[in-house]
Amino acid sequence: MENLQVKALPKEFLLGTATAAYQVEGATRVDGKGINMWDVYLQENSPFLPDPASDFYYRYEEDIALAAEHGLQALRLSISWVRIFPDIDGDANVLAVHYYHRVFQSCLKHNVIPFVSLHHFDSPQKMLETGDWLNRENIDRFIRYARFCFQEFTEVKHWFTINELMSLAAGQYIGGQFPPNHHFQLSEAIQANHNMLLAHALAVLEFHQLGIEGKVGCIHALKPGYPIDGQKENILAAKRYDVYNNKFLLDGTFLGYYSEDTLFHLNQILEANNSSFIIEDGDLEIMKRAAPLNTMFGMNYYRSEFIREYKGENRQEFNSTGIKGQSSFKLNALGEFVKKPGIPTTDWDWNIYPQGLFDMLLRIKEEYPQHPVIYLTENGTALKEVKPEGENDIIDDSKRIRYIEQHLHKVLEARDRGVNIQGYFIWSLQDQFSWANGYNKRYGLFFVDYETQKRYIKKSALWVKGLKRN
């Protein structure tokens, strides 16, 4: 890796951090909260439970103050749907409404701008039982929830509708790490993505019809796919992977339809896996109307993939332990993930490749010139860390600093090349519960002792605090 240092940021560039309600709040049975899909699934299938997680439900003031004290100007967080509507068809929960008002007011008091997601991997259990995003009736339920939040939380000026559509659908219907734990159901995964893109479009239209002040968009986790070499079949496999993971979503968001090229390659993948998806009459009309009304876009980036052609039985191994070499991914007619010599990986087998971030930002600029302002809404790396011996000891996470610096450098380089990107959010503010890894996968700028809930400062937080402004 090149030797570089980021010492200063543009004056108007936002530096923030990110969380998600279910991963940090805890308090899963408090103040009338309803049941979401993880409450049931984890109780039945996991040794890890998300209570108290990082205890953010009670410690939000402390955590937001820590963010402000260390130079973070924005906080990405999400609202728990089942706190607001314990019964998704019932009345709003006043206690939850008051709670989120307090959280947002705390952000504003500390001069931390709240960027709020409505859905972050946490559908209500009743929604899951009725098909989750595969059931179009649940789109109507989501719009009801979105409308309520848009109108109620007027202190929020930055709204994201749905977080990481493909990550959610792939976790539910390809890898099976997320409820309902289905495997290699391509029809379900692609249909869920299309329906979420439609739900996002309807929420954007609702936002503007209501005359809400602020910005609105969605968040995609984009992962560039590179052929492992110059062989024609591997180039084609990388192309198909890109369509599946990136272009399908970007077309639907910024164009409001799927290009001929996208549909051609997507159909090749679907046909090879005896799968299909349905675009109903009127869907693309709605998506086209909404596309130019996106006023911001959230991009999450952690890794790129190197692809080799694969034709055979679908297989995926998920690394849930942090022991290198346990993960694999092989999807018929899409490709196989392979390691490229010289590219480092995390303990969870994620490639560390900052150039992929730069390439994707430039690509969005070139292929979707109508795109709105971009925020890198998640970027960070997980480490295995232990509680320090002294009460005031600083945890040395130099590897995290290096990771952040490399990626932030690429963001600023892309910005210099004309990409309209105006912020960078580190995942995550504090250590938190991981959906499929429990508590040993630590991303935070602040270490959480889960037994006492004490926060310890990491070196990365001090590094962030030391960044200057041009």
UniProtKB/Swiss-Prot annotation:
Disulfide bonds listed in the record: none
A GO MF label: beta-glucosidase activity
Lineage top rank: taxon: Bacteria
InterPro entries per the UniProt record, alphabetical: 6P-beta-galactosidase (IPR005928), Glyco_hydro_1 (IPR001360), Glycoside_hydrolase_SF (IPR017853)
Chain residues that bind D-galactose 6-phosphate: 23, 120, 163-164, 300, 434-435, 441, 443
EC number, as in UniProt: 3.2.1.85
Enzyme class (EC, first level): hydrolase
Transmembrane segments: none
GO cellular component: cytosol
Catalytic activity: a 6-phospho-beta-D-galactoside + H2O = D-galactose 6-phosphate + an alcohol
Pfam assignment, any one: Glyco_hydro_1
Pathway, per record: Carbohydrate metabolism; lactose degradation; D-galactose 6-phosphate and beta-D-glucose from lactose 6-phosphate: step 1/1
GO BP terms: lactose catabolic process via tagatose-6-phosphate
SUPFAM superfamilies registered for this protein in UniProt: (Trans)glycosidases (SSF51445)
Residues annotated as catalytic: 164 (proton donor), 378 (nucleophile)
HAMAP family, sorted: LacG
Family: Belongs to the glycosyl hydrolase 1 family.
Protein name (database record): 6-phospho-beta-galactosidase 1
UniProt source species: Streptococcus pneumoniae serotype 4 (strain ATCC BAA-334 / TIGR4)
